């Protein structure tokens, strides 16, 4: 938003987009890179590493966020220099990976880490749990960097549907490439149909809700994780309305004990993660809860809760103990700090144009 008036900031964001697509072109399956080809990072992992790659846990959202940033920069400033040949090549690679991973059984991607922490590696010789075709695209890991239990991560597929719409618009109105437009349209349609036909389950009351993960063979997880994209964030991402009935039923379910990562204690209640201890809720999840409700008093309650549970640091943490906020992970967490600021803006009806 500030970039609308600040050309230097807009140029910086554009440079960031260009750097992200530079890395995507090195390997669209990697989730973290080195500043230079120095061989740092998890080089002992059993996957196709190179000196540029820090870690190669494949996560759908790693490919969605750069598209979102490129599009929102254009939408809010009119800037288009980020749509350069590197961007175009990166989009082709992203579309190729999304298509390949619709049929993961024939994918070249595998990942094994020598570790005692099961969330840091994929079962089945690095291929993950077995899946069958649904139209959705497979993900090895969640936004938390923890392994998926089932391969079709529904909120990340929701995010993919949204950004494929961005790709379609960019290549129709700014860049003229009918082949990319057609491929994006087909993928968007197939993934959306996959979510609607296979990405839902029922809660304990028998109500239809969105599952967090499915395998296409009848297995599904009823849960949500704090890291975004998650199911709570579906309206924030632009996938659906805050008032969609299936979303509301999903939301009510996930903000209850039916979600194994929902915790309630003396000082707070909210969603945590497999990535942090039990009874720890995440400020990111609390902020997202606030940004996906139309109730202004609820937004205010959550803002006050976040301020009251910062353990006197005046910063947001990764997670904190619902019974003792003095116990927390990460003294400061940039992502959570940003989400708190965005919730403040949201409360005052200041929002990025999407």
List where the protein language model places each region.
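Hydrophobic core segments within long, regular secondary-structure runs in both alpha-
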Residues: 7-24, 67, 71, 84-99, ...
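Catalytic cores of carbohydrate-active enzymes
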Residues: 27-32, 96-116, 152, 162-245, ...
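Well-ordered alpha-helical scaffold segments within catalytic/enzyme domains
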Residues: 1-7, 65-80, 158-177, 232-243, ...
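Aromatic-rich carbohydrate-recognition surfaces in CAZymes
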Residues: 1-119, 333-350
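Active-site-adjacent mobile loop/cap segments within catalytic or ligand-binding domains
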Residues: 155
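Carbohydrate-binding/catalytic loop surfaces
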Residues: 31-57, 107-149, 202-229, 263-287, ...
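Non-catalytic carbohydrate-binding regions of carbohydrate-active enzymes
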Residues: 178-218, 241-339, 346-354
């Amino acid at each position: 938003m500030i970039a609308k008036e600040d050309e230097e900031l807009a140029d910086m964001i554009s440079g960031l987009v260009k750097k992200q697509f530079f890395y995507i072109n090195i390997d669209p399956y990697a989730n973290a890179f080195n500043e230079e080809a120095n061989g740092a990072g998890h080089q002992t992992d059993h996957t196709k590493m190179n000196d540029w790659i820090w870690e190669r846990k494949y996560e759908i959202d790693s490919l969605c966020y750069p598209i979102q940033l490129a599009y929102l920069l254009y939408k809010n400033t009119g800037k288009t220099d980020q749509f350069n040949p590197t961007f175009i090549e990166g989009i082709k690679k992203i579309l190729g990976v999304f298509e390949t991973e619709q049929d993961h059984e024939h994918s070249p991607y595998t990942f094994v880490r020598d570790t005692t922490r099961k969330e840091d590696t994929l079962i089945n010789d690095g291929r993950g749990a077995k899946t069958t075709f649904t139209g959705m695209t497979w993900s090895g890991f969640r936004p938390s960097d923890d392994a998926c239990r089932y391969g079709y991560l529904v909120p990340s597929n929701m995010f993919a549907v949204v950004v494929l719409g961005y790709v379609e618009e960019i290549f129709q109105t700014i860049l003229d490439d009918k082949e990319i437009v057609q491929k994006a349209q087909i993928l968007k349609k197939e993934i959306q149909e996959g979510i609607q036909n296979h990405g839902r389950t029922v809660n304990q009351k028998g109500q239809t809700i969105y599952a967090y993960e499915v395998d296409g063979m009848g297995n599904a997880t009823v849960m949500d994780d704090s890291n975004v994209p998650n199911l709570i964030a579906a309206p924030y991402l632009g996938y659906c309305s805050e008032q969609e009935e299936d979303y509301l039923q999903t939301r009510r379910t996930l903000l209850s004990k039916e979600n194994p990562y929902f915790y309630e204690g003396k000082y707070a209640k909210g969603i945590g993660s497999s990535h942090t201890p039990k009874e720890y809720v995440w400020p990111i999840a609390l902020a997202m809860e606030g940004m996906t409700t139309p109730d202004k008093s609820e937004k205010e309650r959550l803002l006050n809760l976040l301020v009251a549970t910062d353990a006197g640091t005046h910063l947001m943490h990764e997670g904190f103990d619902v019974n003792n906020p003095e116990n927390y992970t990460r003294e400061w967490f940039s992502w959570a700090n940003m989400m708190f600021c965005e919730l403040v803006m949201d409360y005052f009806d200041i929002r990025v144009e999407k």
